[in-house]
Amino acid sequence: MVTAPPEIRSLNGTLRVSLSLRSASGAGGETRYCYVDEHGNLNPTLRLKPGDLLVLKLKNDLSSVPGTMNRRDPPKRDPCASWKMQIASTNLHFHGLMVPPVCHQDDVLNTTLLPQSPAYEYRVRIPANQPPGLYWYHPHPHGHSEEQVLGGASGALIIEGVERFNASVVGLPERLLIFRDQARANAAPVDGRKAPSKDLSVNFVPVPFPDYEPAIIKIKPLQRELWRVLNASADTFVDVHLLTNGRWQNLGLVSVDGVPLRYEQNESKASADGDSTEWVPNVLIPPGGRAEFLYDSPAEGGWTQLLAAGVDTVPVQDEDTPGFVALPGFTPADDDDYTPPRWMVKITARADAPLPASVLPKTVSSVRALLAPLASVYPTRTRKLYFSEKVMDAKNPRGSTVFYLTEEGHVPTAFDPSAAPNITVRQGEVEDWIIENRSQEVHTFHIHQTHFVLLERDKEAVKENYLRDSVDVPYWDGLSKQYPSVKLRIDFRGAAVVGTFPYHCHILQHEDGGMMGTIQVLAAGEKRSK
């Protein structure tokens, strides 16, 4: 049975919580990770309002990973100082929040907590103009992010107020679903069925291979709810479809990556008299992405199944396909990461089902004026970046791979934490970035501290009424004359972006493998260093 994660809400403008990151060995020998608060709650959901202060004390209590045993004295070092990330080190990223990339707020480049270090305090002021919606927190120690997120270290962070931007959600019950992936100890086929590269869970209810027994939710009949769905997977895409009583059901899309649809169009007053919902057949959520949508339950005794559809992450062609060009190290889809379709959740309509504990307000407050819509702002400049990969030993395609995210005109180089920022811009600017995928597996572009609007896919205009912080870029199929690409308009107007922060592939195996760069945003009057 799927249950809601424990919640902690802000009180009188402040949310205070102490989290301990702990580890333990799983049944298959894997290391599991979890945040535990002072009351014993696991991976609690943090709920705040725009303008609130988050005071979070984080303690690194890892004990079941290499490098954490036999330490007697706490390490004497400044956790804010640049430090080589280790498998036993950790930090915290507030994914999607528009807060400064500095020590004690949202810095992941220099902040490193080692086991037995004193508790480290984050003090994060939620901006008054932070879009209301679903965000999340997770560890971000470069080189070891995948290990900790794949092990389960993540939690939701909800900024209240979505009802101010969409009349259709006012007063609705809300339900939070968190998808997480987990490495499989045994990848052997069963009865001729290929095992997925990773299993998935819903709110820590496992839906494992080979039976994929779905998690269960009971819901009131003919009930509309706002579902907040977080893909907290390290590496796995979740393509959400709903099948109700044998027929496909549309989703009422309300928000993407924490931002309500048409958010920028609500400049001076609440939209409680307007419905910005878009009804769609499915929603593809990349690793780290979020989607919030309306779900209408069936009548008494009816059922809905939530399908995580299969996602092709590499070309289905092989070397025998006419005209196909295989890059060094390419392996066919059947031999690579495998993401099959899975029935993840079965929802049954029962009159005795409890309502979710969280219900959106029935009254709506005013909305602050916003900046000009991003898509309408003329960009300061345009850049092109591209994803690429290099297998270290071409004779061993299963060997070590280095991942790159490179600005056009520069030599591909794996992320180096000691290097100067790859890109420098000035606060107040807006840039267009074209992101190409020159590799033969899918990637997900993510940038910290800000959002962007998707303008084009493969040079074709896209009309989206929402902002994002992550977007998928499909693989090059080995046949097309042009690489898959997206064109993004990225917002550097907000004051919180000043500083240095990363952009990277949010498939964390790739990010850990070097597919990351840094951008320095100078204050409006600050001079560029020579």
Short names for language-model regions:
Residues 118-124, 215, 281, 289-293, ...:
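Short strand-edge motifs at loop-to-beta-strand transitions and within beta-strands
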Residues 127-165:
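Hydrophobic or amphipathic alpha-helical targeting/insertion segments
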Residues 1-114, 119-121, 192-227, 232, ...:
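N-terminal, post-signal-peptide metal-ligating segments of extracellular/periplasmic oxidoreductases
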Residues 143-149, 310-321, 509-515:
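Short acidic/polar inter-strand loop motif in beta-rich domains
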Residues 125-131, 296-302, 493-498:
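Short, surface-exposed loop/turn segments at beta-strand-coil junctions that are enriched for proline
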Residues 99-115, 183-363, 460-462:
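Histidine- and aromatic-rich segments of cupredoxin/plastocyanin-like copper-binding domains
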Residues 7-9, 155-172, 178, 330-335, ...:
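Extracytoplasmic/periplasmic copper-protein system
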Residues 28, 79-114, 249-281, 325-328, ...:
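Active-site pocket scaffolds in enzymes
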